[in-house]
Amino acid sequence: MLKIVTVCGNGIGSSLLLRMKVEAIAKDLGIAVDAESCDSNAAVGKGADLFVTVKEFKDIFPEGTKLCIVKSYTNRKKIEEDLVPVLKEMSGQD
C-alpha cells in the first residue's frame, strides 16, 4: 500500500479535493493507497511514499522527496496525466 499525502496551502479545501481524486484514480488502477491531505507547513514533516501537489509548493520539500506535481487540484483528466505514470511506476505496473 502506498502512503500518499496531498498538499495545499491550508490543508482544507484543495488538498482534500485532490486526495479524493487520487483515491479514485488509484482505485480505478487497482492500486492500494492510504491517502491524506494536509497543509504545506505540516507536509514537510510527514512520512509518505509520495507527495502530490502543484508546482507552487514543490520547493518546500527536501531534495530526494518523491513528488508528483499536478496541473490541477480538481480536474481529474489533468491529474491523471501527471499521476497515473507515477502510480504505475511506484506499484510496479509500468
What are these regions (language model features)?
Residues 40, 52-59:
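Short, polar loop motifs at secondary-structure junctions
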Residues 2-39:
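Conserved active-site segments centered on acidic
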Residues 13, 59-60:
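Short glycine-rich, flexible loops that bind phosphorylated cofactors or substrates
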Residues 44-45:
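A short, aliphatic-rich alpha-helical micro-motif
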Residues 35, 48-54:
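Short, hydrophobic beta-strand segments that form beta-sheet elements in well-ordered domains
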